[in-house]
């Protein structure tokens, strides 16, 4: 089950009470005070675990509390510190108190102190004085801290796939990565985000995210895509997946509508570096002309390159995809325009190298 938002209550432990006791030994008639200090309450930490990508483990478990400190003992023995509470979350988890962002947990194995446990109380040995040799008072431990927080997950990926329902995003991510999403010939097959690791060679790999298809009005709450757009906010490069075989909606119109929804949702997201993938090109007769025309629409000059082992008749890429792959000075210009077929794996091998270059 994929869960990306949950409310929980976290609490640190209470400090243990100090001890009231007096030294009692043979031949010692009136021993002095020897009550030990109470142990500090346990702390609460958030720890990032790279092996999980959902908050589902928090469903049904609302309270997360550290242990209380133990009471002080006799003979000046201090009480044991309360056991800490380690709350494990996936990378990309944000912790909110009300509407205010409190913690942003990104790095794997990162551990952040959230709440400090209450201080243990002092034993009566601390209160002996010249005028009070037999103090019968010890401090209580301080209370712990409790907070109601909201966990929001924003998946961390290098490449984010954006497209309309049934554009072939799930097929693509299953073809070039280790992800195994549900694939079927109907809209909204993808109901939750999918993450996949794309291995380019023995030394290089990157993470790709596929979210449910976006429809017109998604930024206003229609469809499924809007609730998951936040999962591509952290991506470095967006890849628009367009269905080149659609007769009712051409690739230019698909692109314009997708970009409009992104701009409405988040200008920052819309301004990310991006490329365009013309999917299902194996069933389009005039794919070369279509690609040239689309490049002209983006004010790009289509160019045939063999640097990435492209299929000979599908080698149209942005000129920036040269060996040095310099950054495009125009942030709104596509880094690449690549025709491919996720079903027949046409140009998908080359796509891995294209995306890796884009990330560099």
UniProtKB/Swiss-Prot annotation:
It comes from the Bacteria. Its cofactor is Mg(2+). Its main location: cytoplasm. Residues 1-156 form the Obg domain. Transmembrane segments: none annotated. Residues 157-360 form the OBG-type G domain. Keywords: Cytoplasm, GTP-binding, Hydrolase, Magnesium, Metal-binding, Nucleotide-binding. It is found in: Cytoplasm. Mg(2+) binds at residues 170, 190. GO terms for cellular component: cytoplasm. It holds the Pfam family GTP1_OBG. Its EC number is 3.6.5.-. GO terms for biological process: ribosome biogenesis. GO terms for molecular function: GTP binding; GTPase activity; magnesium ion binding. The keyword Hydrolase applies. GTP binds at residues 163-170, 188-192, 210-213, 279-282, 341-343. Belongs to the TRAFAC class OBG-HflX-like GTPase superfamily. OBG GTPase family. An essential GTPase which binds GTP, GDP and possibly (p)ppGpp with moderate affinity, with high nucleotide exchange rates and a fairly low GTP hydrolysis rate. Plays a role in control of the cell cycle, stress response, ribosome biogenesis and in those bacteria that undergo differentiation, in morphogenesis control. Monomer. This is GTPase Obg. It comes from Helicobacter pylori (strain J99 / ATCC 700824) (Campylobacter pylori J99). The lineage of its organism: Bacteria, Pseudomonadati, Campylobacterota, Epsilonproteobacteria, Campylobacterales.
């Amino acid at each position: 089950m994929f869960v990306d938002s949950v409310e929980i209550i976290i609490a640190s432990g209470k400090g243990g009470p100090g001890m009231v006791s007096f030294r009692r030994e043979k031949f010692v008639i009136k021993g002095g005070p020897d009550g030990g200090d109470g142990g500090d309450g346990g702390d609460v930490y958030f720890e990032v675990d790279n092996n999980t990508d959902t908050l589902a483990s928090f469903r049904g478990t609302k309270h997360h509390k550290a242990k209380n400190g133990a009471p002080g003992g006799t003979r000046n023995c201090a009480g044991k510190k309360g056991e800490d509470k380690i709350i494990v979350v996936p990378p990309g988890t944000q912790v909110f108190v009300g509407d205010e962002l409190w913690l942003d947990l990104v790095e794997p194995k990162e551990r952040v102190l959230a709440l400090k446990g209450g201080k243990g109380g002092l034993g009566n040995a601390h209160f002996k004085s010249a005028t009070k040799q037999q103090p019968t008072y010890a401090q209580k431990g301080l209370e712990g801290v409790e907070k109601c927080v909201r966990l929001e997950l924003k998946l961390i990926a290098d490449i984010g796939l954006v497209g309309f329902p049934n554009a072939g995003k799930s097929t693509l991510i299953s073809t070039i990565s280790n992800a195994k999403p549900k694939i079927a010939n109907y809209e909204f097959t993808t109901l939750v985000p999918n993450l996949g690791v794309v291995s380019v060679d023995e030394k290089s790999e990157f993470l790709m995210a596929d979210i449910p298809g976006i429809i017109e009005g998604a930024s206003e709450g229609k469809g499924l895509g809007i609730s998951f757009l936040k999962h591509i906010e952290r991506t470095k490069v967006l890849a628009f997946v367009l269905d080149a075989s659609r007769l009712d909606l051409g690739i230019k119109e698909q692109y314009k509508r997708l970009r409009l929804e992104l701009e409405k949702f988040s200008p920052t997201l819309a301004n990310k570096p991006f490329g365009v993938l013309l999917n299902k090109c194996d069933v389009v007769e005039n794919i070369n002309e279509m690609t040239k025309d689309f490049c002209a629409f983006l004010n790009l000059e289509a160019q045939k390159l063999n640097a990435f082992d492209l299929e000979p008749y599908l080698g149209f890429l942005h000129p920036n995809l040269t060996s040095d792959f310099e950054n495009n000075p125009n942030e709104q210009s596509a880094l690449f325009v690549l025709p491919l077929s996720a079903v027949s794996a046409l140009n998908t091998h080359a796509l891995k190298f294209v995306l890796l270059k884009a990330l560099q």
